[in-house]
Amino acid sequence: KVVGSNPTGCTNMKKILLLLLLFLLSSCSVVVYKVADIKDINPVTGQYEIGTKRFLIIDSSRTNWYLDDYNKDFRRLMVQVWYPAKVEIYDKKSSYIDNQSALTHTIKNQGYGVPKILSDQIGSIKCNSWSDAAPLLSNSFPVLIFSHGHGGLRTQNTNQVEELVSHGYVVVAMDHTYDAGFVEFLDGEVAYSLTSRSDENTTIISPEEFYTRFSYRTNDIKFILEEINHFYNYDNNIFSIMDKDKIGIFGHSYGGLTSFYTAFYNEEIKSCFALDGWFEPMPDSLVLENINKPMFHLGQHNKG
C-alpha cells in the first residue's frame, strides 16, 4: 500500500514539542499572548547522580543519506550517553538543547506552529545531568537505547531518560541524521531534516521510498548495538559500566516502530517499550510471529 510521508500518532515535531510542553516539562504554563514560563526538567527520584556525554560516531559501511546530494559521505551519528556518575564541584549542568538558533530555525521553517515566545525559552532549560561527569565505576548497569520520533531529537525525552538513569541504567540515544529535526555535530555543523515538511505533511510517497528511509533508522540502531560492544574506542570508563548482556530499547512514535522492528531481529535486545508507537507500516506477518521477549506499548486504542 501507499504510505504517507508523515506518520500519524504524534510523529511530527509539532506534536513532539506539544508533548514536551504538556508532559515532559509538566510544570509549564502556556498562556496565549503572554510570556510563558518554561521550567527546567523535573528533579529525579532515584539514588544516582547523572552524567552525560556526546560522541560523533561514523558508520563507514553506509552513506550519509540515500539522496544524490548526500550519499557521498559516510553516515554520521551524534550519540549521547547518560549514565550514573560521580559528580564533582567543577562539573557543569547540561542543557536540554545546545543550539537554540537551530531549534528556532527548525520550528520556524517547518511550520510547527509553536509560538516563538515559547521556542526561544527551550534553550534555557536545565537538566539534572552533568556534562562529561566521571562515570560511577562501582557497578555495571543495564543499557537502554532510545529512538526519537519523526522530526524529533535525541534529547526529546530527557525527563524519562534522566529518571531511568537515576535508578541505575545507562541510556544511549542518537539523532537519526536527516530524519531528526536537526543535528548539530561536534564541529558546529548543523544538518536539518530532509523528511519533515510543513505544508506537505500529507504528501504520499511510495512504499519503496518509505522503507528506504526507515532502513536508515533501523540500521542506525543496529550499528549502535555493534558499537556498544566496542565502546572502549570512545570512552573506556563508560564502556566498563555497561552491562552488555542486558540491553533494552524504547522509542516515541516513529521511534516506537523503529524500536519494535529492530527488537524483532536483534537477539542482543532483550526487551522493548514503545511510547505511542506508530505501527501502521509494520507487516502483519511480523506482528503475528511468536514474540519471545517482553514487548510493551503505551498508547491510544486504535491509534497508530
Residue ranges, per PLM feature:
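C-terminal motif of bacterial Sec signal peptides marking the signal peptidase cleavage site
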Residues: 25-27
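Domain-level recognition of soluble alpha/beta enzyme cores
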Residues: 31-144
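Active-site machinery of serine-nucleophile hydrolases
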Residues: 85-90, 95-117, 155-202
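Short substrate-entry loop that stabilizes the transition state in hydrolases
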Residues: 125-184, 281, 303
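Gly/Ala-rich beta-loop-alpha elbow adjacent to hydrolase catalytic centers
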Residues: 149, 250-255, 259
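Alpha/beta-hydrolase active-site loop
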Residues: 178-244
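The feature captures the conserved acid-bearing segment of alpha/beta-hydrolase catalytic domains
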Residues: 270-304
